[in-house]
């Protein structure tokens, strides 16, 4: 069975993990209202998708 001959240092361990960081979601600006939204999804602010109204959004008073 394979066993490490030497202890892995903190620097070597951390260098190996340098690619493990998580990225945030890729957001795009809505062409209708300008709010940030997820791509290929209906805008939660205005309800538009691909240039037309898909969801009727209630106005907050």
Curated annotation (Swiss-Prot):
GO terms for cellular component: large ribosomal subunit. Keywords: Ribonucleoprotein, Ribosomal protein. This is Large ribosomal subunit protein bL32. Residues 1-22 have a biased composition (Basic residues). It comes from the Bacteria. InterPro entries: Ribosomal_bL32, Ribosomal_bL32_bact, Ribosomal_zn-bd. PANTHER family: 50S RIBOSOMAL PROTEIN L32, LARGE RIBOSOMAL SUBUNIT PROTEIN BL32. Belongs to the bacterial ribosomal protein bL32 family. Residues 1-24 are annotated as: Disordered. The keyword Ribosomal protein applies. Pfam families: Ribosomal_L32p.
